[in-house]
Amino acid sequence: MNTPLQDAERSRAGEPPASGAAPLIPDGLDAVIVLVRHGQTEFIVQGRFQGQMETPLTPRGERQISRAGLRLAHPHDDPPLPIPETAPFIIAHSPLERTRRSAELLVEAFAAAGRATPPLRPEPGLKEIAQGDWEGLTDTEISARFGDSLGAWRRWPELTYAPGGESLEEVLRRVESTLTKLLTELADGARPGTMDRHQVLGYADHSAEPKRWALLVGHGGVFRVVVCALLGLSLDHFWNFDFGLAAVSVIEIRAGRAVIRGLNFDAGEEGRIETDDTGRDAKGAL
């Protein structure tokens, strides 16, 4: 294994660090990935684990997503979002009903704002983590039937998972496959980026130009894995990230390096940050 000093020598020679695995992000890619979690659902209101069970958006959930769509259609309105003014080249979404409907509402919001409407594409790799025998149950019911397995999942998610469900390693494999495809598409025809520029916000970037970007509509659990994959973090960081209902999160790719620009940008009720968190952090939200 190379030492950091050896990797630094390779970097000075214009060579990438010698690591065992091929990098997920294409070298030199400049792009933006925007994550939008689905809106409130019936199961979230009831405090039930969703996993891959179908559960519809509530009327409030549809309103949440429609507001997020208008925000994305006017990204540079005050306060601005750190995303390009151009439309995304694709809206890739989990094929589950709650995310499919959320993606449709985002497209409707783009159209209502007179913006170009990006194509929709279902991506099975963005499905929520399968929670097996826990799906449809409340945490109280899970604890009564399965003892401390839920507590173990919340403490060591990289080591434990629901009976009949998916391990995070299994989820990571499908997430990486989906991201590899999307990142390759983003790199198609994109201008190669460079790290030879300011990496601290606030400085003018005179080389900046509109970047290609992709909009992903998914779930809180799978998005945690997406962020770990893009940042090169191990899965024991799973619970370090959280995603609000219908909130917008932005990851910028700078010359092949993922940088979090913001998590949980949220227009909220009538353009304000929501103060009523009913359903946002319900234990059945995963």
Question: Which residue ranges define each predicted feature?
Answer:
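Short, conserved phosphate/pyrophosphate- and ester-handling motifs at nucleotide-, phospho-/glycolipid
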Residues: H38, G61, H219
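Phosphate-coordination/substrate-recognition cap region in phosphate-metabolizing enzymes
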Residues: N2-P23, D27-G28, R67-L150
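Short hydrophobic segments within beta-strands
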Residues: V36, A92-S94, V217
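Loop-to-helix element that buttresses phosphate recognition and phosphoryl-transfer chemistry
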Residues: E42-L106, Y161-T178
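Acidic, His/Gly-rich catalytic cores of divalent-metal-dependent hydrolytic chemistry
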Residues: R261-L286
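Active-site-adjacent alpha-helix immediately C-terminal to a catalytic or transition-state-stabilizing loop
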Residues: R100, S177-R257
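Short, P/G- and charge-enriched loop/turn segments at secondary-structure junctions
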Residues: S19-L24, A204, L235-W239, D276-T278, ...
